[in-house]
Amino acid sequence: MSRSDVFADAPPADWAQAVPLLREGAHLPLLRSVARLRRSKTVYPPEGQVFAALHCTPLHTVRVVIVGQDPYHGAGQAHGLAFSVPQGVKPPPSLRNVLKEAAAQKPEAPAAAGMQHNGVQTDLTPWAEQGVLLLNTALTVEAGRAGSHAALGWHAVTDDIIRTVSERCPAVVFMLWGNHARQKAALVDTGRHLLLESVHPSPFSAHKGFLGCGHFVTANSWLAARGLLPVLW
Protein backbone atom coordinates (compact mmCIF):
# COMPACT_ATOMS: atom_id res chain seq x y z
CA MET A 1 0.00 0.00 0.00
CA SER A 2 1.36 3.39 -0.94
CA ARG A 3 1.49 6.41 1.35
CA SER A 4 -1.06 8.10 -0.91
CA ASP A 5 -3.55 5.31 -0.13
CA VAL A 6 -3.30 6.10 3.57
CA PHE A 7 -3.16 9.87 3.41
CA ALA A 8 -5.91 10.47 0.84
CA ASP A 9 -8.12 11.06 3.87
CA ALA A 10 -5.74 12.96 6.13
CA PRO A 11 -7.44 15.30 8.61
CA PRO A 12 -6.67 19.01 8.22
CA ALA A 13 -3.65 20.36 10.08
CA ASP A 14 -5.54 22.37 12.69
CA TRP A 15 -7.53 19.37 13.88
CA ALA A 16 -4.57 17.00 13.55
CA GLN A 17 -2.52 19.20 15.86
CA ALA A 18 -5.27 19.85 18.41
CA VAL A 19 -6.86 16.41 18.84
CA PRO A 20 -4.52 14.17 20.85
CA LEU A 21 -5.41 10.91 19.10
CA LEU A 22 -5.04 12.51 15.66
CA ARG A 23 -1.75 14.04 16.69
CA GLU A 24 -0.56 10.60 17.80
CA GLY A 25 -1.66 9.04 14.49
CA ALA A 26 -4.41 6.84 15.93
CA HIS A 27 -6.41 7.33 12.74
CA LEU A 28 -3.74 5.80 10.51
CA PRO A 29 -4.45 2.14 11.36
CA LEU A 30 -8.14 2.88 10.79
CA LEU A 31 -7.44 4.34 7.35
CA ARG A 32 -5.31 1.32 6.49
CA SER A 33 -8.14 -0.99 7.55
CA VAL A 34 -10.62 0.98 5.44
CA ALA A 35 -8.26 0.89 2.46
CA ARG A 36 -8.06 -2.90 2.73
CA LEU A 37 -11.83 -3.17 2.96
CA ARG A 38 -12.27 -0.98 -0.13
CA ARG A 39 -10.41 -3.59 -2.20
CA SER A 40 -13.28 -6.06 -1.92
CA LYS A 41 -16.24 -4.04 -0.62
CA THR A 42 -17.92 -0.72 -1.26
CA VAL A 43 -17.26 1.66 1.61
CA TYR A 44 -18.90 5.04 2.18
CA PRO A 45 -18.17 7.89 2.09
CA PRO A 46 -15.95 7.80 -0.99
CA GLU A 47 -12.20 8.01 -0.54
CA GLY A 48 -11.13 11.58 0.16
CA GLN A 49 -14.30 12.44 2.11
CA VAL A 50 -13.79 10.55 5.38
CA PHE A 51 -12.68 13.69 7.24
CA ALA A 52 -14.92 16.09 5.30
CA ALA A 53 -16.56 17.35 8.50
CA LEU A 54 -13.20 18.57 9.80
CA HIS A 55 -12.18 20.07 6.46
CA CYS A 56 -15.45 22.00 6.15
CA THR A 57 -15.39 23.30 9.74
CA PRO A 58 -12.04 24.50 11.11
CA LEU A 59 -11.69 24.04 14.86
CA HIS A 60 -11.57 27.74 15.66
CA THR A 61 -14.92 28.30 13.89
CA VAL A 62 -16.95 25.64 15.73
CA ARG A 63 -20.05 26.98 17.47
CA VAL A 64 -22.46 24.06 17.03
CA VAL A 65 -21.81 20.30 17.02
CA ILE A 66 -24.43 17.90 15.65
CA VAL A 67 -23.55 14.28 16.38
CA GLY A 68 -24.61 11.50 14.01
CA GLN A 69 -24.01 7.77 14.24
CA ASP A 70 -22.48 6.53 10.99
CA PRO A 71 -22.57 7.57 7.32
CA TYR A 72 -25.52 6.74 5.11
CA HIS A 73 -24.96 3.31 3.57
CA GLY A 74 -26.82 3.86 0.30
CA ALA A 75 -25.16 4.72 -3.01
CA GLY A 76 -24.50 8.42 -3.58
CA GLN A 77 -25.67 9.57 -0.16
CA ALA A 78 -22.71 9.85 2.22
CA HIS A 79 -20.21 12.65 1.68
CA GLY A 80 -18.61 12.96 5.09
CA LEU A 81 -21.08 15.27 6.87
CA ALA A 82 -23.50 13.82 9.41
CA PHE A 83 -27.13 13.82 8.23
CA SER A 84 -26.20 15.58 4.96
CA VAL A 85 -26.39 14.28 1.39
CA PRO A 86 -24.97 15.88 -1.78
CA GLN A 87 -26.97 18.52 -3.57
CA GLY A 88 -29.88 17.06 -5.53
CA VAL A 89 -29.91 13.69 -3.75
CA LYS A 90 -33.27 12.78 -2.28
CA PRO A 91 -33.04 13.31 1.49
CA PRO A 92 -33.23 10.20 3.67
CA PRO A 93 -36.07 10.26 6.23
CA SER A 94 -33.93 11.49 9.14
CA LEU A 95 -32.61 14.39 7.09
CA ARG A 96 -36.13 15.27 5.98
CA ASN A 97 -37.10 15.65 9.61
CA VAL A 98 -33.99 17.69 10.44
CA LEU A 99 -34.80 20.04 7.57
CA LYS A 100 -38.44 20.20 8.57
CA GLU A 101 -37.53 21.17 12.13
CA ALA A 102 -34.97 23.74 10.95
CA ALA A 103 -37.49 25.29 8.54
CA ALA A 104 -40.17 25.40 11.22
CA GLN A 105 -37.92 27.71 13.25
CA LYS A 106 -37.96 30.33 10.49
CA PRO A 107 -41.03 32.54 10.88
CA GLU A 108 -40.69 33.69 7.28
CA ALA A 109 -40.59 30.16 5.83
CA PRO A 110 -43.25 27.43 5.80
CA ALA A 111 -42.31 24.11 7.37
CA ALA A 112 -42.73 22.43 3.98
CA ALA A 113 -39.68 24.29 2.69
CA GLY A 114 -37.47 21.85 4.52
CA MET A 115 -38.94 18.97 2.54
CA GLN A 116 -37.48 20.10 -0.78
CA HIS A 117 -34.52 18.24 -2.25
CA ASN A 118 -33.81 20.17 -5.44
CA GLY A 119 -32.02 23.06 -3.70
CA VAL A 120 -29.31 23.61 -1.15
CA GLN A 121 -31.32 22.16 1.73
CA THR A 122 -30.16 18.56 1.33
CA ASP A 123 -26.46 19.47 1.31
CA LEU A 124 -25.63 20.84 4.74
CA THR A 125 -22.24 22.19 3.67
CA PRO A 126 -23.51 25.78 4.19
CA TRP A 127 -24.14 24.88 7.83
CA ALA A 128 -20.67 23.37 8.14
CA GLU A 129 -19.09 26.48 6.65
CA GLN A 130 -20.78 28.57 9.37
CA GLY A 131 -19.18 26.55 12.16
CA VAL A 132 -21.61 23.65 12.52
CA LEU A 133 -19.53 20.50 12.96
CA LEU A 134 -21.54 17.64 11.45
CA LEU A 135 -19.73 14.71 13.03
CA ASN A 136 -20.59 11.03 12.75
CA THR A 137 -19.17 8.88 15.54
CA ALA A 138 -18.10 6.24 12.99
CA LEU A 139 -16.60 7.86 9.91
CA THR A 140 -17.05 4.96 7.47
CA VAL A 141 -19.59 2.22 6.74
CA GLU A 142 -19.94 -0.72 4.37
CA ALA A 143 -22.57 -0.36 1.64
CA GLY A 144 -25.94 -1.67 2.75
CA ARG A 145 -24.78 -2.50 6.28
CA ALA A 146 -25.68 0.17 8.83
CA GLY A 147 -23.31 0.22 11.77
CA SER A 148 -20.87 -2.17 10.11
CA HIS A 149 -17.81 -0.11 11.08
CA ALA A 150 -18.96 0.70 14.61
CA ALA A 151 -16.34 -1.64 16.06
CA LEU A 152 -13.54 -0.57 13.72
CA GLY A 153 -12.14 1.94 16.21
CA TRP A 154 -13.53 5.26 15.00
CA HIS A 155 -15.38 5.99 18.24
CA ALA A 156 -12.20 6.61 20.22
CA VAL A 157 -11.09 9.16 17.63
CA THR A 158 -14.43 10.94 17.33
CA ASP A 159 -14.86 10.98 21.11
CA ASP A 160 -11.51 12.74 21.28
CA ILE A 161 -12.68 15.23 18.66
CA ILE A 162 -15.77 16.04 20.74
CA ARG A 163 -13.67 16.30 23.89
CA THR A 164 -11.22 18.65 22.15
CA VAL A 165 -14.04 20.94 21.02
CA SER A 166 -15.36 21.03 24.58
CA GLU A 167 -11.92 21.88 25.97
CA ARG A 168 -10.71 24.36 23.36
CA CYS A 169 -13.76 26.23 22.10
CA PRO A 170 -15.29 28.93 24.31
CA ALA A 171 -19.02 28.54 23.63
CA VAL A 172 -20.55 25.69 21.64
CA VAL A 173 -24.03 24.22 21.31
CA PHE A 174 -23.97 20.42 21.26
CA MET A 175 -27.04 18.81 19.68
CA LEU A 176 -27.35 15.16 20.67
CA TRP A 177 -30.25 13.35 19.02
CA GLY A 178 -31.03 9.77 19.93
CA ASN A 179 -29.60 7.41 22.53
CA HIS A 180 -26.31 6.86 20.70
CA ALA A 181 -25.54 10.58 20.42
CA ARG A 182 -26.71 11.29 23.96
CA GLN A 183 -24.03 8.96 25.30
CA LYS A 184 -21.55 11.65 24.27
CA ALA A 185 -22.94 14.12 26.82
CA ALA A 186 -20.29 13.03 29.31
CA LEU A 187 -17.60 14.42 26.99
CA VAL A 188 -19.03 17.96 27.16
CA ASP A 189 -18.26 20.60 29.79
CA THR A 190 -21.78 21.85 30.47
CA GLY A 191 -20.41 24.70 32.53
CA ARG A 192 -19.18 26.33 29.32
CA HIS A 193 -21.36 24.85 26.62
CA LEU A 194 -25.06 24.28 25.91
CA LEU A 195 -26.24 20.68 25.66
CA LEU A 196 -29.46 20.06 23.71
CA GLU A 197 -30.78 16.50 23.76
CA SER A 198 -33.71 14.88 21.99
CA VAL A 199 -34.90 11.66 20.45
CA HIS A 200 -33.48 10.80 17.03
CA PRO A 201 -34.99 12.49 13.94
CA SER A 202 -35.70 9.05 12.47
CA PRO A 203 -39.35 8.64 11.40
CA PHE A 204 -39.65 6.00 14.12
CA SER A 205 -39.10 8.57 16.87
CA ALA A 206 -39.22 12.09 15.40
CA HIS A 207 -42.82 12.65 16.50
CA LYS A 208 -41.94 11.65 20.06
CA GLY A 209 -39.99 14.81 20.80
CA PHE A 210 -37.69 15.80 17.95
CA LEU A 211 -40.18 17.68 15.81
CA GLY A 212 -41.01 20.79 17.78
CA CYS A 213 -37.94 20.54 20.04
CA GLY A 214 -36.87 24.06 19.05
CA HIS A 215 -33.17 23.24 19.08
CA PHE A 216 -32.30 25.48 16.16
CA VAL A 217 -33.87 28.62 17.58
CA THR A 218 -32.60 27.80 21.09
CA ALA A 219 -29.07 27.45 19.73
CA ASN A 220 -29.20 30.80 17.96
CA SER A 221 -30.63 32.56 21.01
CA TRP A 222 -27.87 31.12 23.21
CA LEU A 223 -25.16 32.10 20.71
CA ALA A 224 -26.56 35.62 20.32
CA ALA A 225 -26.60 36.08 24.10
CA ARG A 226 -22.84 35.50 24.00
CA GLY A 227 -22.21 37.94 21.19
CA LEU A 228 -21.88 35.24 18.53
CA LEU A 229 -23.54 35.29 15.15
CA PRO A 230 -26.58 33.05 14.71
CA VAL A 231 -26.47 30.19 12.24
CA LEU A 232 -28.46 30.62 9.04
CA TRP A 233 -30.23 27.28 9.08
Swiss-Prot record:
Keywords: Cytoplasm, DNA damage, DNA repair, Hydrolase. GO terms for molecular function: uracil DNA N-glycosylase activity. InterPro entries: UDG_fam1, Ura-DNA_Glyclase_AS, Uracil-DNA_glycosylase-like, Uracil-DNA_glycosylase-like_sf. It comes from the Bacteria. It catalyses: Hydrolyzes single-stranded DNA or mismatched double-stranded DNA and polynucleotides, releasing free uracil. The keyword Cytoplasm applies. Its EC number is 3.2.2.27. It is found in: Cytoplasm. GO terms for cellular component: cytoplasm. The active site is at D70. GO terms for biological process: base-excision repair, AP site formation via deaminated base removal. Belongs to the uracil-DNA glycosylase (UDG) superfamily. UNG family. Excises uracil residues from the DNA which can arise as a result of misincorporation of dUMP residues by DNA polymerase or due to deamination of cytosine. PANTHER family: URACIL-DNA GLYCOSYLASE. This is Uracil-DNA glycosylase. It comes from Oleidesulfovibrio alaskensis (strain ATCC BAA-1058 / DSM 17464 / G20) (Desulfovibrio alaskensis).
